[in-house]
From Swiss-Prot:
UniProt protein name: Small integral membrane protein 29
Keyword list, A-Z: Glycoprotein, Membrane, Transmembrane, Transmembrane helix
GO cellular component, one term: membrane
Species of origin: Homo sapiens (Human)
Superkingdom in the source lineage: Eukaryota
Length: 102
């Protein structure tokens, strides 16, 4: 019997390859999520600050708006206006594309 061993070629360990691929992927994903959360919080703060700044300038009252809309409708009913549809305005203006004189 022979006491010799056959040298094996070095093979890449599959666990180390997974680490090389998944490590950067998870790192980039984590950085992206952190950036998205920071941007969301900044936007929310900016919108809240703008809302608190504009709120004292404007007070919304739906009843007041409804009353104003009714007044506009009533005032418009007193003024007779002629409103043409889009088809009636174009039908009488049809002209030939080429004006040929014979």
């Amino acid at each position: 019997m022979s006491n010799t061993t056959v040298p094996n070629a070095p093979q890449a360990n599959s666990d180390s390859m997974v680490g090389y691929v998944l490590g950067p992927f998870f790192l980039i994903t984590l950085v992206g999520v952190v950036v998205a959360v920071v941007m969301y919080v900044q936007k929310k703060k900016r919108v809240d600050r703008l809302r608190h700044h504009l709120l004292p300038m404007y007070s919304y009252d739906p009843a007041e708006e409804l009353h104003e809309a009714e007044q506009e409708l009533l005032s418009d009913m007193g003024d007779p206006k002629v409103v043409h549809g889009w088809q009636s305005g174009y039908q009488h203006k049809r002209m030939p594309l080429l004006d040929v004189k014979t």
